[in-house]
Amino acid sequence: MFIENFKVESPNVKYTDHEIHSVYDYETTELVHENRNGTYQWIVKPKTVKYEFKTDVHVPKLGVMLVGWGGNNGSTLTGGVIANREGICWATKDTVQQANYFGSLTQASAIRVGSYNGEEIYAPFKSILPMVNPDDIVFGGWDISDMNLADAMARARVFDIDLQKQLRPYMESMVPLPGIYDPDFIAANQGSRANNVIKGTKKEQMLQIIKDIREFKEKNKVDRVVVLWTANTERYSNVIVGLNDTVESLLASLDKNEAEISPSTLYAIACVLENIPFINGSPQNTFVPGLIDLAIRRNCLIGGDDFKSGQTKMKSVLVDFLVGAGIKPTSIVSYNHLGNNDGMNLSAPQTFRSKEISKSNVVDDMVSSNVFFMGLVNTRPRWIKYVPYVAIERAMDEYTSEIFMGGKSTIVLHNTCEDSLLAAPIILDLVLLAELSTRIQLKAEGEGKFHSFHPVATILSYLTKAPLVPPGTPVVNALSKQRAMLENILRACVGLAPENNMILEYK
């Protein structure tokens, strides 16, 4: 059974006109390795920590600025939100299609809230806490191409022609602001698009981004802005002592116009200085150590890296299943070919390397959770090939595992990925959850004052391929754990226990 919304009635939660306040007992464990009767033993001690959460219920008018707004993802997301807002239907060769948000965690998934008369009751994910309605988002952004969004949508060839025709009047007037272009960081084949670029030194470019954000906010009368990178994958930046390893060195390098500061890092610096949440949707190392330190000092949300949309999402599910079932993965071989602009940019070795690194650690935490399998998975080789005729990505994976008594099992997956149709709802979720997390404050027992989440937003890790985490924090890639973490944190904000699936009342 499905219900549209709900309200929690409990001594641990209080709703007011301004906030939701909850008290939550966080049940965890503490491990100690100590001498007991002459031998060292691992002792697990259950531990309860009392937390308080308060969530601002005022939903702001949200502006979303996309870096690479005129790319496939940017034009697809913008058109998709307009189609949903306007209730557009269009004809395909098979049917009359209605706009939807399938693929969005916040807009198209559900959570279990309990049972009623022996039936499981579910509610929309977006009903847990007040969230921005996608229909109300104001879009803007930058692109190194000056093509308007209607023409960019046609160039992307993602939407059906009938839908494009209906969207064109809404999107023709949308033109990206000039973007930062540095040919040293992306493939040379992108140069033909670069007719809309910000001139000047790197610091001047960064200051122009700040000016653009302020003008966008003022022009559109938005309360809050979130910036997200959905532009080309850059090559990895060199992390060098004295260049970008500390806040001071990074800002000094900016003053000196050091060549090794990437465009994505310039956008991120601008956002952090303006206290604007910034999310990196590509695999490069935008968040060099000095930038992470700057975000922490200024308590500005940053998140990334790389959208987890198709092939990698499947991998984070399948390997979790294999390891959890006691099956020993021994080899994962992956191959992609695609013909869109993403594939063309990734055809350059230096940008491909960023994607390779992003994909390389996806299974590490799952394999290391089982002592029998540690260090046994070979996840190479992997290839990404640019095939112009094939617009839609094809992903092929072969998983080889060892099973009972020396047997071998092979699983082969072929995944045809509509990349931008998978990525667009993920972008939507990222900006909505980033905005929501800025309205949540918490404090643990013994802490005097409420504070926000850590600026490095692990709460977004379900949506990213290589989750950015605070220093010293374990990286979790298993999709089910990431989903449970996100849902259970939001449940805690309304005083609900985590969903543990025990269902003891029926045992």
Curated annotation (Swiss-Prot):
Keywords associated with the record: Cytoplasm, Inositol biosynthesis, Isomerase, Lipid biosynthesis, Lipid metabolism, NAD, Nucleus, Phospholipid biosynthesis, Phospholipid metabolism
Leader sequence residues: none
Reaction(s) catalysed (UniProt annotation): D-glucose 6-phosphate = 1D-myo-inositol 3-phosphate
Gene Ontology molecular functions: inositol-3-phosphate synthase activity
Main location: cytoplasm
UniProt keyword Ribonucleoprotein, yes or no: no
Pfam family, one: Inos-1-P_synth
Top class in the EC scheme: isomerase
Pathway: Polyol metabolism; myo-inositol biosynthesis; myo-inositol from D-glucose 6-phosphate: step 1/2
Chain's role: Key enzyme in myo-inositol biosynthesis pathway that catalyzes the conversion of glucose 6-phosphate to 1-myo-inositol 1-phosphate in a NAD-dependent manner.
Name listed for the protein in its UniProt record: Inositol-3-phosphate synthase
Organism of origin: Citrus paradisi (Grapefruit)
Record lineage: Eukaryota, Viridiplantae, Streptophyta, Embryophyta, Tracheophyta
